[in-house]
Amino acid sequence: MKLFLCSHFSSVGSLIKEEIENKNVAFIPTASLREGYTGYVGSARKLFKKLGAIVTEIDISTEAYLTIQSVFEDADVIYFTGGNSFFLMDQLRKTGTDELLKKELEKGKLMIGESAGAIICAPTIQYIEQMDEKPEDYSQEDDAGLDLIDFYVLPHYLTAPFKKVTEKIMTEFSDLNLSPINNRQGIVIDGEGSKVVCKD
């Protein structure tokens, strides 16, 4: 399985430019839809464009399943923006896109997860509730994540405005295998393991 998990994609995406250049990218902004600040979504769009990617944007909370399936099947790369992890995970599970995504990743496609998009890869997303408020209309009975990895990404570590909350999560969830990364770091996962990469 190929994953690139990060806090801020436009700051580190060039580290994997060979994986993105001239490729078909399914761009999923769903996590950001209820957020006040979404500048990172526009920054990501610009970087994909600069790298010559062919981007198809799709909101999994409103699109028909067959449309999502078609976009995912045509994509080389599936990218999830940051935003609210609980809202994103709820939509993935509610629509069946979670299983569709796993099928496509089994074919060797690359998933890029930024912030919320990285958090959802863990076995559970419960650890992030202090950073991401759970929506009132959250419809799942548990806080299961996609369970693609056996660790828990903690994005924006010691980075404003998340300095205090990330420190708190590190302390309170010390029993979890947390992987803290700042906005200049990313985690590359392939069949052989994972490594943290850094943008100077």
Question: In which residue ranges do the predicted regions lie?
Answer:
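Short glycine-rich anion-binding loops that position phosphate/pyrophosphate groups of nucleotides
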Residues: 33, 83-86, 117, 158
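Glycine/threonine-rich flexible loop motifs
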Residues: 85-94
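Glycine/Thr-rich phosphate-binding loops of Rossmann-like dinucleotide-binding domains
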Residues: 13, 35, 88-89, 121-122, ...
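Short, active-site-adjacent cap segments at secondary-structure transitions
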Residues: 86, 118-121, 186-188
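N-terminal beta1-alpha1 cap of cysteine-dependent amidohydrolase-like domains
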Residues: 1-77, 81
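Conserved anion/nucleotide-ligand pocket segment
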Residues: 144-149, 153-191, 197
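Class I SAM-dependent methyltransferase SAM-binding "motif I" and its flanking Rossmann-like core
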Residues: 97-159
